[in-house]
From Swiss-Prot:
Stated family: Belongs to the RtcB family.
Leftover remarks: Ligation probably proceeds through 3 nucleotidyl transfer steps, with 2',3'-cyclic phosphate termini being hydrolyzed to 3'-P termini in a step that precedes 3'-P activation with GMP. In the first nucleotidyl transfer step, RTCB reacts with GTP to form a covalent RTCB-histidine-GMP intermediate with release of PPi; in the second step, the GMP moiety is transferred to the RNA 3'-P; in the third step, the 5'-OH from the opposite RNA strand attacks the activated 3'-P to form a 3',5'-phosphodiester bond and release GMP.
Entry-annotated residues carrying Phosphoserine: S300
Co-factor binding comment: Binds 2 manganese ions per subunit.
Cofactor: Mn(2+)
PROSITE patterns (UniProt xref): UPF0027
GO biological process: in utero embryonic development; placenta development; tRNA splicing, via endonucleolytic cleavage and ligation
Name of the protein in question: RNA-splicing ligase RtcB homolog
GO MF annotations, alphabetized: GTP binding; metal ion binding; RNA ligase (GTP) activity
Residues that bind Mn(2+) 1: D119, C122, H227
Complex formation: Catalytic component of the tRNA-splicing ligase complex.
GO CC annotation terms, alphabetical: cytoplasm; endoplasmic reticulum membrane; nuclear envelope; nucleus; tRNA-splicing ligase complex
Residue positions of the active site: H428
Length: 505
């Protein structure tokens, strides 16, 4: 029985300038309410999607994002509310940009791979340099080419960092500690990673042989899709104090952003877990509104296996970004004929966008241990939080928001308000407005490349035919997304970056 669009609207209420409430009853069995953050233009997109779904036009097999936020609110053990961030768009199970927290002390509470996503620990790392735009402009093309030559890119790309099966086992367990030991990372890189680049509960034995086989050749590679390495320049500084703490002191300063994840290995870990969980749901009689929300009780063998395998895939992704950092440092050193150290190629921060983690949060005045699912959303802890690096204790955690190819990116900082409202979580990027298939139908790849060239952006692409999927037109406007988070107070703007070169899968 489907309701009309007007009937659906009765369950939606605007509670502040940037926030809507989804009341219980919007979908069956909601344990808690839902909320989503939008500004006027993002709001239109959300409601348009719901209206189309009511007419019977689905979103490529996915439910509209609002319905997905509601269905997550119906999962066993969820606390407080199911939260949609401004870049939310429909995805597998959970919408991308939907976060939810589950009570670790509730025996019914679940973990859902759909709440993490297939690209486990897909994330972003930002490096700074002491170069200025004027240093890079004359050698921009050489630099883009050097990065393209150093970093293996594209769908089936193979890594250049030598690795055998034993190395992979160790990397899955150790994360950035492996890169450090092998000489592919600097000691201080680790300080500036979420989780210090290593999830301790990782167990390589919970990663299937098939996943390892997919992961072994891909280490230190940039995938296709929305993965990229970008040379960027500082375009605007909103918070000078925070920027200085990050080593950013003037407009025009050159940075490098690396966006990548756990490649085929993470995808296989998620796929394997979904199969195991379908069985667990039958056994434990867990009922969900959407079968894509396959899940298992956190304490069940399937739940624990997934968390250990997911942590290992997370570690793989950190090693992957560390390896690409190593290759980026080499490329810059070669072009500028100096050492990475002399170029001050330090990691500002490294964040994850797709992960589930155990965290302490205050809910209704009580501290609780929660399993926080962040899918297409970023941890944004406030100043003085014990889990962020010493350097950022006074500023709050840096949050890296990658725009889309050829648009700007942002660095934000976490806030206390975000801690209370969204479990210390904010947006992760622009968020799709057009599906991949639609983008391919509507856009021509040569036009997209020409447009970037007109903007003075050097571009190196391994699979040009995939470029349309990632064209700025396929996405929501990242500035809208970031401003919504800023105005809602769940994170604050620190720095805006614009690209001068893009290296893509």
């Amino acid at each position: 029985m489907s309701r009309s669009y007007n009937d659906e609207l009765q369950f939606l209420e605007k509670i502040s300038k940037n926030c809507w409430r989804i009341k219980k009853g919007f979908v069956p069995n909601m344990q808690v309410e839902g909320v989503f953050y939008v500004n006027d233009s993002l709001e239109k997109l959300m409601f348009e999607e719901l209206r189309n779904a009511c007419r019977g036009g689905g979103v490529g097999g996915f439910l509209p994002a609002m319905k997905q936020i509601g269905n997550v609110a119906a999962l066993p053990g969820i606390v407080h509310r199911s939260i949609g961030l401004p870049d939310v768009h429909s995805g597998y199970g959970f919408a991308i940009g939907n976060m939810a927290a589950f009570d670790m002390n509730d025996p019914e509470a679940v973990v859902s791979p759909g709440g993490v996503g297939f690209d486990i620990n897909c994330g972003v790392r930002l490096l700074r340099t002491n170069l200025d735009e004027s240093d890079v402009q004359p050698v921009k093309e050489q630099l883009a080419q050097a990065m393209f030559d150093h970093i293996p890119v594209g769908v089936g790309s193979k890594g250049v960092i030598p690795m055998n099966a034993k190395d992979l086992e160790e990397a899955l367990e150790m994360g950035v500690d492996w890169s450090l030991r092998e000489g592919y990372a600097w000691a201080e890189d680790k300080e500036h990673c979420e989780e210090y680049g290593r999830m301790l509960q990782a167990d390589p034995n919970k990663v299937s042989a098939r996943a390892k086989k997919r992961g072994l050749p891909q280490l230190g590679t940039l995938g296709a899709g929305n993965h990229y390495a970008e040379i960027q320049v500082v375009d605007e500084i909103f918070n000078e104090y925070a920027a200085k703490k990050m080593g950013i002191d003037h407009k025009g300063q050159v940075c490098v952003m690396i966006h990548s994840g756990s490649r085929g290995l993470g995808h296989q870990v998620a796929t394997d877990a979904l199969v195991a969980m379908e069985k667990a749901m039958k056994r434990d009689k867990i009922i969900v509104n959407d079968r894509q929300l396959a899940c298992a009780r956190i304490a069940s063998p399937e739940g624990q296996d997934y968390l250990k395998g997911m942590a290992a895939a997370g570690n793989y992704a950190w090693v992957n970004r560390s390896s690409m950092t190593f290759l980026t440092r080499q490329a810059f050193a070669k072009v500028f004929n100096t050492t990475p150290d002399d170029l001050d190629l330090h990691v500002i921060y490294d964040v994850s966008h797709n992960i589930a983690k155990v965290e302490q949060h205050v809910v209704d005045g009580k501290e609780r241990t929660l399993l926080v699912h962040r899918k297409g959303s970023t941890r944004a802890f406030p100043p003085h939080h014990p889990l962020i690096a010493v350097d950022y204790q006074l500023t709050g955690q840096p949050v890296l928001i990658g725009g889309t190819m050829g648009t700007c990116s942002y660095v934000l900082t976490g806030t206390e308000q975000g801690m209370t409202e969204t479990f210390g979580t904010t947006c992760h990027g622009a968020g799709r407005a057009l599906s991949r298939a639609k983008s391919r139908r509507n856009l021509d790849f040569q036009d997209v490349l020409d447009k970037l060239a007109d903007m003075g952006i050097a571009i190196r692409v391994a699979s040009p035919k995939l470029v349309m999927e990632e064209a700025p037109e396929s996405y929501k406007n990242v500035t809208d997304v970031v401003n919504t988070c800023h105005d809602a107070g769940i994170s604050k703007k620190a720095i805006k970056l614009r690209p001068i070169a893009v290296i893509k899968g």
